[in-house]
Curated annotation (Swiss-Prot):
Native organism: Caenorhabditis elegans
InterPro entries: ATG16, G-protein_beta_WD-40_rep, WD40/YVTN_repeat-like_dom_sf, WD40_repeat_CS, WD40_repeat_dom_sf, WD40_rpt
Intrachain disulfide bonds: none
WD repeat residues: 243-281, 288-329, 330-368, 371-411, 413-452, 459-498, 504-534
Protein name per UniProt: Autophagic-related protein 16.2
Tissue specificity statement from the Swiss-Prot or TrEMBL entry: Expressed in neurons, pharyngeal muscles, body wall muscle cells and intestinal cells.
SUPFAM superfamilies according to UniProt: WD40 repeat-like
Subcellular location: Cytoplasm; Cell membrane
A GO biological process held by the record: macroautophagy
GO molecular function: protein-membrane adaptor activity
């Protein structure tokens, strides 16, 4: 069927082509005829125009002028339209650019709006959470306010009870002091009775009585070197004395032949050295402390003795009568050191990180100084001002104070915590012992370190080890953990001598005292022993 259609189409196409070839000559003839006819008609029109040209010439000129004017109007309108088109295109371009800018800004604002909406949603959620938390906190606040009011009332009650207890304790302490003084008075009366009995017996022998009288009044001759105005280095041990039932924490010469010791047995013992310097006998015991005694001090007349104790108090005794005069309580931790200050005050430093200034007559605290670090030692009578004192601390600092100010006037930092202080005779230099096994000599006037003293075998015993000046300040000395005493020349820092107080290295030296006469060195240790070197 497909082949028949193809052959039919080819047949038609062939016939058309044949017809085209046959009629091509006739077609050319008709075409030429049409051209000749058009030329003839054009010739006739030319003639008619030339005949009528003169009749219509005027009309044509008028029409031509009108047409020119119309053409000019058209051109003017065209020029105006072109300019309007240019302006319109420019405005369109500006509008499109503004549209594009506005579209971009719109997109940015849309993005920012979406972000703000999201942020608002988050903030609304946070606000709801905060409101809920605030409600909970407010509820807790109301509860805490109620609790605080209750605790405040309870604190007020406890403070009242505390004041009552303090008053009761003070009354009991006063009664205890009265009982102790009564006991001491009784002991004195007994001693006087014994003395009267001895005097009665001594009247039988006049020579023996004369000897005892001369011994009592100290008329026996002394060697010239007792009154030498220079310090003599110790060369031999005169005696070793067991002075306490525990560690001996401090020792002080009260006079050329009398010294006091403080121990862990809560007692202060007064001793007198024999005339031949080979022994010492107990004169009296100052009791009343409820804990180990740490430091001793005395007035210039040697009439009163001040002791600081681990029972958080300081106590003041009359040395002659052994009466307990005052108890200064107010610290919340052990009192490391206390000194008689000015003429009627006591200055004390404690492990509770405070220093207190006490009035002796009223037994009350005049001022508290908040230090912020454990106080190890205090010295007074320093510098040119009577209101100055110096303290040593756990935080490696030596602080200089004026009692009239609440803050330290200056501080000097050393290499380690500062265990003890000692002031020179003129009050212008202070000797500081620190746990880095060195001694530092500090000028009180400009706070500068003048000298450092150290030795290879010297090791600081503990946090309460005491270093001192000799009586004239010619030497500085300190006890070591190996039972030795190291003595340096103050000016040259030369190690002049090392003396050993015990064969065992376990007898750590706690404190030293140089005799006011210049001859005689006392050293106390942790083995209950006090040793005299001369």
């Amino acid at each position: 069927m497909t082949d028949n259609r193809t052959s039919f189409r080819l047949e038609i196409l062939n016939r058309l082509c044949k017809r085209e070839r046959q009629q091509r000559c006739v077609k050319d003839m008709f075409k030429n005829y049409s051209l000749l006819d058009e030329q003839l008609q054009q010739s006739h029109r030319s003639r008619s125009v030339s005949v009528n040209d003169e009749h219509f010439k005027g009309n044509v000129n008028d029409r031509l002028a009108v047409m020119k004017e119309e053409m000019a109007n058209v051109y003017r309108m065209k020029s105006k339209n072109d300019q309007d088109l240019i302006d319109a295109n420019r405005k369109l371009a500006d509008s499109e650019s503004r549209y594009s800018l506005v579209s971009s800004q719109r997109d940015k604002l849309r993005i920012e709006t979406d972000a703000i909406v999201k942020k608002m949603t988050v903030l609304e959620n946070e606000l709801a959470e905060l409101k809920e938390e605030n409600s909970v906190i407010n509820t807790e606040r109301v509860s805490l306010v109620a609790t605080c009011n209750y605790l405040t009332e309870k604190k007020t009650q406890l403070d009242n009870e505390r004041f009552q207890l303090l008053n009761r304790i003070r009354e009991l302490q006063e009664k205890s002091a009265e009982f102790m003084n009564a006991e001491i008075a009784l002991q004195e009366e007994r001693a006087q009775m014994r003395i009267r009995e001895q005097i009665a017996k001594a009247t039988a022998d006049l020579n023996l009585g004369d000897e005892r009288a001369s011994s009592a009044f100290g008329t026996s001759p002394e060697t010239l070197d007792e009154f030498m105005m220079t310090d003599v280095l110790p060369s031999e041990v005169k005696f070793k004395l067991s002075t306490h039932d525990g560690e001996v924490h401090d020792v002080e010469w009260m006079s050329d032949d009398t010294f006091a010791t403080a121990g862990s047995d809560s007692k202060v013992q007064i001793w007198r050295v024999s005339p031949n310097k080979t022994d010492a006998s107990k004169v009296s015991t100052l009791s009343g402390c409820l804990g180990p005694v740490n430091r001793l001090d005395y007035d210039s007349q040697r009439h009163v003795c001040l002791a600081s104790s681990n029972d958080k108090t300081c106590r003041l005794w009359n040395i002659d009568s052994q009466r307990l005069l005052s108890t200064f309580s107010g610290h919340t931790d052990k009192v490391s050191s206390a000194r008689l200050f000015q003429s009627h005050n006591v200055i004390s430093g404690s492990a509770d990180r405070t220093i207190k200034n006490w009035d002796i007559s009223s037994i009350r605290c005049l001022k508290s100084y908040l230090v912020g670090s454990t106080v190890f030692d205090i010295v007074a009578k320093c510098g040119v001002s009577q209101s100055s004192f110096i303290s040593s601390h756990f935080d490696k600092k030596v602080r200089f104070w004026d009692a009239r100010s609440s803050d330290a006037t200056y501080s000097v930092e050393l290499g380690q915590k500062v265990s003890s202080l000692d002031i020179s005779m003129d009050g212008l230099q202070v000797l500081a012992s620190s746990r880095d096994d060195t001694l530092s000599l500090i000028d009180v006037r400009n706070y500068g370190i003048i000298h450092l003293y150290s030795a290879e075998q010297y090791k600081t015993s503990c946090d309460s080890t005491r270093a001192i000046f000799s009586s004239t300040g010619e030497y500085v000395l300190a006890g070591s953990s190996n039972s030795s005493v190291f003595i340096w020349n103050t000016k040259t820092t030369k190690l002049e001598k090392v003396v050993k107080t015990a064969r065992s290295d376990s007898a750590q030296i706690m404190s030293l005292a140089w005799n006011p006469s210049g001859r005689g060195l006392l050293a106390c240790d942790r083995q209950k022993t006090c040793t005299l070197w001369r």
